[in-house]
Design a protein with these regions (language model features):
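Eukaryotic scaffold repeat domains enriched in small/polar residues
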Residues: 2-352
Length: 352
């Protein structure tokens, strides 16, 4: 499952990226992009109630602290509110929401007010093209600029610091990074949904390894639309494998360690998993756009329950989410980005 590290690449990879795809069939690339978009968004005919009586019998005790809706359009430079936001990064006490449909990043305060808008209006070099994931290393923001096959590194004020082309030489399509995680070593990982791979790079943008076969697969061989990524304290990577309905665990060197989850709409099953986050206790949180819930698993993959009711104490209450996608955990709080223009902040139970 692991491809040997590539050596001798230019750190930024931009020249290689320009040469890499001269023979790509444009129509084929567009078709693949459409398939990926459909798998990632899954926003058509979304349920307002959680399916499966078995699922509703397992409620994880997280409490809603804040619900932030789209800022008023009249306070934004473009005059448009959120358009399918996809992810969030928490940097200190600062919240950065990736507003994918508008190709911009919004910094919000804790009440949802817009503090700054990061896009080409703020810096002409900040050209986002359908970016789907954002993360932080504690100092900088990292953005998976999906439509440009690259990862951008930005200051919290939006100034571009680095730009890394991503992808494996010889793959049939340009990379489409839709998941992103940053290690405490300075390495970063991306999921390439176009070529069914997970890629790890060092801080200079050199490819360290590539996991996956380069085609749709399952089991230990590979992925079928890899998406959200998270790292545990040991440096193991957790990969959301959307169309296989599972989460795959990889060692720091890319070796396959195991998986959990299965396709379905009952307890512990995953219908359209999107993103993953891990708390300090090692519990794994997986957003599911079709179940309109966040499923929770223990460090040993034991199913612990779901988050998704307006009132966790009332199993008959309505659904909290419509299309949960991007996740982040900071301290004892879980941040959930809903594609229907909302951010939810939840207090997690004390797991010490």
């Amino acid at each position: 499952m692991v491809r040997a590290a590539t050596t001798g690449e230019a750190p930024e990879g931009t020249a290689a990226a320009r040469r890499r795809w001269p023979g790509v069939d444009v129509l084929a690339a567009l078709i693949v992009a459409c398939v990926i978009a459909a798998a990632v968004l899954a926003v058509a005919v979304l349920p307002r109630d959680l399916p499966g009586a078995e699922l509703s019998a397992h409620v994880y005790p997280a409490r809603l602290a804040r619900h932030l809706e789209s800022p008023s359009a009249d306070v934004l430079p473009s005059g448009a509110g959120w358009n399918q936001p996809s992810d969030i990064a928490v940097l200190g006490g600062r919240w950065f929401v990736l507003d994918s449909g508008n190709d911009r990043i919004l910094e919000l305060d804790t009440k949802g007010a817009v503090l700054q808008v990061l896009d080409q209006r703020s810096d002409r070099r900040l050209a986002l093209r359908g970016a789907m994931a954002i993360a932080s290393d504690g100092t900088y923001l990292y953005v998976a600029n999906s439509g440009a096959a690259e990862v951008l590194v930005l200051t919290p004020e939006g100034g571009p610091v680095r730009r890394f082309a991503v992808g494996v030489d010889g793959d049939s399509l340009p990379a489409r990074p839709i998941g992103l995680a940053v290690a405490n070593t300075g390495d970063f990982l991306v999921s390439d949904a176009a070529n069914q791979r997970v890629l790890r790079y060092d801080g200079e943008g050199r490819l360290l390894w590539a996991a996956g076969s380069g085609r749709r697969a399952g089991g230990e061989e590979g992925f079928n639309t890899p998406a959200g990524l998270a790292l545990d304290r040991a440096g193991n990577a957790y990969v959301v494998d959307i169309l296989n309905g599972r989460v795959v665990k990889l060692a720091p060197d890319g070796r396959y360690l195991g998986q959990f989850g299965r396709l379905g709409d009952t307890a512990g099953a995953l219908a359209r998993p999107k993103d993953v986050a891990i708390d300090a206790a090692g519990n794994v949180f997986v957003s599911d756009g079709l179940l309109a819930a966040v499923q929770v698993f223990g460090p040993d993959a034991e199913y612990l329950g779901f988050i998704g009711l307006e009132d966790p104490a009332d199993r008959g209450s309505g659904a909290l989410f419509r299309a949960p996608a991007g996740l982040a955990i900071a301290g004892s709080r879980l941040y959930v980005v809903d594609r229907f223009a909302s951010v939810f902040v939840l207090d997690l139970p004390d797991t010490k």
